[in-house]
Every structure is written in C-alpha cells, then in structure tokens.
Amino acid sequence: MSKAILLDKKLQQSNELALPERYAQIKEHNLYLYVKSYLSSLRANSASAKKRGEVSGGGKKPWKQKGGGRARAGSITSPVFVGGGVSHGPSNDKNYTLKINKKQKRLALECALFQKAQEGKLFVVDSLAMPSGKTKDAYAMFKALKQRSTLFVAQMSDEPTFLAFRNLQQCYLADANELNAYLVAAFRSVVIEKAVFDEIIAEKKGE
C-alpha cells in the first residue's frame, strides 16, 4: 500500500498516511488522457496560410488564353504564381481541444498522487503559511525537504505566502482548487497541506 509521508514542523517524518487501496487499481491511461487534454488546451492555433480564394487581387485574367507562348492562366492567385495562394497549407480554424469528463479528471489526479506516493515523493504538512512573505523563509522550507522541483499545495494561499514562493524557480504554489493531475506529474515531489489531503482522500471515486 502506498503512503504519503507526514512531516512535522521541523519537516522531519513523523508518520505515514495511507492512500485508499482503490488508487492502485486506477489505469494510467486516465492520466495520459488528462495530460494530453491539458496540453492541447494550451496549444495556440496560430499557423495560417491564405488559400487562392483568400488572396487579394486576381480578378483579371493575367494574359490571353492563346498566342502568347505561355501556359494558360486564369488568375494570379493560383498557387503556381509568387504571391498566390498556398495549396494544402496550415489553417487556424482547426480545434485541437480534447475534452474529458469529470470522472476521468478525478481518476487522473488520484493516479498521479498514487505514483508520487510510490516514489516516496508525496509529503503532507499541517500548514504552508508564510506570514513574513519572505522568499528566504520559503526557500528554507524547500531546502530542508532536500527535493528537486516541488509543487506546494495549500488550502488557500494568502498574499504573503504567495509572495514568499513566487520567486523560487523550482517551486510552484497552487491552491486546492487549482490542483490537477498535470501539475502533480510535472514536478518531482509534492508537498500538500493536510486539510487538502484529507479532502482528496475523503472524496469518493470519480466525484
């Protein structure tokens, strides 16, 4: 059974918190689908080329049909002309969004947390509050964890706490309502407040 590591105020291991057994039964394909959907939603569909009907001009036949010794042509917007339309070029009317349902999102998050717990990279603390708002205090916590890139998850971060974590390059502070499977998978380790952890564990499968 995979377990999260409970840390005390000195960031030393004090206990272990078991994850529900059903987490082990979740297929990794749910995580794959969510990450694919998340990244596709970030894709900027900006590549575009004008077709021959979208290029300006071309209303007049460039030269007469016969007698010129040149190939016949009906419009300068033809793809064979410089400045003409593009055949089979990229279009910005394509929608890359991939939708998944609420249950799959939930399963993906549970799968990501389970994987972090298996790796021994899921930590639980009582609070992440940084009343001082100083980066050095947040860095001291990060350094004490002896981890690499770390996702911190708070129930609801206040402004001082947000400011304390903002400038740390290998860290990211997320609120509970911002937490998703992609964020969990993107960082090497996850530090989550116990209140948030308890809420996640208490929720039923797929809800």
UniProtKB/Swiss-Prot annotation:
The annotated region (Disordered) lies at: 49-73
Quick check: keyword rRNA-binding in the entry? yes
Q: Tell me where the transmembrane regions lie.
A: none
Any GO MF annotation of the entry: structural constituent of ribosome
Which GO biological-process labels does this protein carry? translation
Q: Which UniProt keywords apply?
A: Ribonucleoprotein, Ribosomal protein, RNA-binding, rRNA-binding
Provide the leader sequence positions: none
Of the GO CC terms on this record, one is: ribonucleoprotein complex
Purpose of the protein: One of the primary rRNA binding proteins, this protein initially binds near the 5'-end of the 23S rRNA. It is important during the early stages of 50S assembly. It makes multiple contacts with different domains of the 23S rRNA in the assembled 50S subunit and ribosome.
**What subunit structure does UniProt give?**
Part of the 50S ribosomal subunit.
Which NCBIfam families does the UniProt record give? rplD_bact
- Family (UniProt): Belongs to the universal ribosomal protein uL4 family.
Concerning HAMAP family, the annotation shows: Ribosomal_uL4_B
Q: What is this protein called?
A: Large ribosomal subunit protein uL4
- Chain's gene name: rplD
